[in-house]
Amino acid sequence: MIRNDTMLKGQFVLKKTQIALSAALMGSVLLTGCVTQKSNTESNGPKDTQVSYVEYFADNAVGNPLAIVQHPAAIHKNGITYVSYQGPKEDPFVATYNHSTKEWSGPFKAGTSELGRRDGGKKFDNHGKPTMLIDDEGYVHIFYGGHGGHSSNGKNPLGNTHFGANKHAVSKKPYDITQWEDLDNITPFGTYNQVVKMDNGDIYLFFRHGAHRSDWVYQKSVDNGRTFSSPVSFLKHKRRTDIEAVDSWYAWVGKGEGDNLIVSYDYHVCWDGGAGINGRGHTTERHDVYFMNFNTKTNQWSNVEGESLALPVTKEVADDKTLAMKTGALWTFNGTSHLDNEGHPHIAINAGVDRGAKTGGPKQTRHVWWDGKKWLGGNNIIEGYQGVSRGDFRVTDPSDIRYLVTYEKEGDAVLSWWDSDEDGNAFSEGSTVLRKNNATFAISALIENAHPEAQMLVAEKESDENIKIYLVGEDGPVPRALSNL
């Protein structure tokens, strides 16, 4: 899914001229947010015109417009990077950047989210952010709009409901993001969409089948997303008998080797109202890190040692067979997982001290990995840092791990590279990709099949509307002409 460092360095050399130009332009942008460039054109108008550039490609995002869990949010294919984010009314918006012509197209609205048109609840629900796929025929797919589905959709057979409806939009033409249509072929009871296309073209859509107290499932398509099979549960929610709570989960699914998918996840103790620590009731309390494999050819699930697992996996089985790390009193927020060149899994997990808030407290990104015999790691990427951090990573050799992490520094939002040549035990900060005053960043997972110029999407949050979205690469953001916004 993510190109290795050799391919990235090769592409970086080919694009050296453009990156140098972008860097020159951005010298002014970093101070002012806008840069002016003179250009000579073969037109009937003035020979010298001034073009103003900005670092962002869109400024109409709302709420929390990006997250790592809904992935991929962007894909690079045939020299074009396709990007998506949550725009006005929580609708999905899609744009493209052509790396050869340096031209942006869009953003275009890809669908209509029920979350932005619901009665009651918070101003922004934020759970229906778009997830993207490009099928073997070139059609662009967007999955969006659900926070478990609504009771008006009927009874959820695999859990409970909340708001919205999980939807599936597809472009009307291959590789064309200007026109879209909805396909009524997935259950409305969904949220946290994650989609993977296998080498043979089969599509696997993973999501939680409802609100907090629901199973995690997948639906499979063998016809480029035109139809999907019924949901199959792979993580089980169930009532606990020892405390006033329900077993629940948060998962991240990615491409493994060959026909395999890899799944990392953490456990959510879903307390009843008035129960739990200090009677806080339902909070975001989560703990521990788990890992398992899914062989899509044989339909067999297994743990890291190859031991078979029966579906759906329960808390008891997960603790016994798939546990990668106990986090103790630390609360978690799940991250991503990838394989190194030896086929060993590496997991990003965010964990922090419970400070009594509804969300516990700030969580810091940590690295956990399997060395072929045992699970190791758990150290902070940013040693000594106690604020909020989030990130995704590439790993080639077990001793060559590279994270792109956002964190707070001196009141600024920072996105920078962090590198480890010590098997993930310690990391050092490299170049800063983006830094903004008096803001926070929300980020996507690393872009699928990423181009060196376009590695990740970043939302600059100063308020909850008119949020700027950036496409950032190895050395900074891809600029866009202000007149083209």
Swiss-Prot record:
Q: Where is the composition biased (Basic and acidic residues)?
A: 115-128
Where in this protein does the record put region Disordered?
108-128
Q: Name one GO molecular function term.
A: lyase activity
Where in or outside the cell it occurs: the entry states: Cell membrane
Signal peptide range equals: 1-33
At the top level, the lineage of the source is: Bacteria
Top-level EC class as recorded in UniProt? lyase
Query: What single Pfam family name could you report for this chain, choosing any that match?
Result: BNR_4
Q: What positions are marked as the site Neutralizes the sugar carboxylate group at subsite +1?
A: R208
Query: Which UniProt keywords are present, listed alphabetically?
Result: Cell membrane, Lipoprotein, Lyase, Membrane, Metal-binding, Palmitate, Signal, Zinc
Q: What is its main location?
A: membrane
Q: How does it sit in the membrane?
A: Lipid-anchor
Q: Which InterPro entries match?
A: Sialidase_sf (IPR036278)
Q: Where is the lipid attached (S-diacylglycerol cysteine)?
A: C34
Q: What is its EC number?
A: 4.2.2.-
Family annotation (SUPFAM superfamilies):
Sialidases
Binding positions for Zn(2+) per the UniProt entry: H212, H268, C270, H282
What does the record give as the function of this protein? Ulvan lyase involved in ulvan degradation. Ulvan is the main polysaccharide component of the Ulvales (green seaweed) cell wall. It is composed of disaccharide building blocks comprising 3-sulfated rhamnose (Rha3S) linked to D-glucuronic acid (GlcA), L-iduronic acid (IduA), or D-xylose (Xyl). Ulvan lyase catalyzes the endolytic cleavage of the glycosidic bond between Rha3S and the uronic acids GlcA or IduA, producing oligosaccharides that have unsaturated 4-deoxy-L-threo-hex-4-enopyranosiduronic acid (deltaUA) at the non-reducing end.
Protein name, per record: Ulvan lyase
What is the source species? Alteromonas sp. (strain LOR)
Q: What is the lineage of its organism?
A: Bacteria, Pseudomonadati, Pseudomonadota, Gammaproteobacteria, Alteromonadales
